[in-house]
């Protein structure tokens, strides 16, 4: 029976708290509040009510019949997190942490964001709960995701562009943590993925677990059996953990797809487990992309939500234990998968989600028609239209 993390916030050897002394007490307070509230039926009811009435859960499980027929292999089902309010799975966690912050008496939210989806979700729940919101976002991502930046500002959030490093998610997270150290008395840091020091990976995992819980129930209702493979994209890894949680004790192949960028044999990728080694990043022992001197190597992906140089400690454990297989998809493979799903099913996925789709399509062709693949469609692609337009038009691939 799967039972992690332990009382020290460890997943095997991974996880833990590697933070400045000034953050040990705030983390302890968050852990204590979370442990109390997750056992409180009133808190659970309030959270579930918000998911249902505000975010629109449960999300659909869609059989991609046209796509499955075209590929000629396994039946492909999509767990439609793109149908959530704000367009991705990020709202699940944001609502839970906003409730936690409010119960703790915090009036200000700090968040980091890459693709902008967690930033939008944080700004959305801050508006809903009457909290102030400060979002740190890498300068590169601000430019790539200008529409989401505008949405955050429209929702009343302050967006702070981060110019250090590559100006991406890692750098935004660094600045958000620095800011929190200085303002932890009245600010709540709302981490957007299953990363960071304990108890954050556990908190985010708990607030995303309904993805897999719903999908499992829906699959049994539709097919009367479990899928053969469950596939999700992995950056920090929250949509994947949310999907995997329900299947960890079942005989189901679990597959995580990292961003291979221009190729894992080039320096331009974000394939942390495929190419990384053990180290500490943002308060947690995990795998990360680093050089022989322990310096972070800047990750790259066409997807702003996947170019993180680390990975959640639970993923590190699931890799080390062999329970989950981690593979990677290139920019081009993701773009091709995105176009194919859009053309065959009329569903425009986020570029992040398209990495999972790419591997699902590849694996489907080697499987029989009575086998099932379940893919987590973590978000919609509206935010990526500008990027897609530039890339595909330059390649002459739009019709």
From Swiss-Prot:
Report the Pfam families cross-referenced here.
PALP
Q: Which GO terms describe its cellular component?
A: cytoplasm
What is catalysed by this protein?
A: (1S,2R)-1-C-(indol-3-yl)glycerol 3-phosphate + L-serine = D-glyceraldehyde 3-phosphate + L-tryptophan + H2O
The EC number(s) given in the record are 4.2.1.20
The record, for CDD domains, names:
Trp-synth_B
Query: Which family is it part of?
Result: Belongs to the TrpB family.
Summary of the function given for this chain in its UniProt record: The beta subunit is responsible for the synthesis of L-tryptophan from indole and L-serine.
**Could you tell me what this protein is called?**
Tryptophan synthase beta chain
What species is this protein from?
Bacillus pumilus (strain SAFR-032)
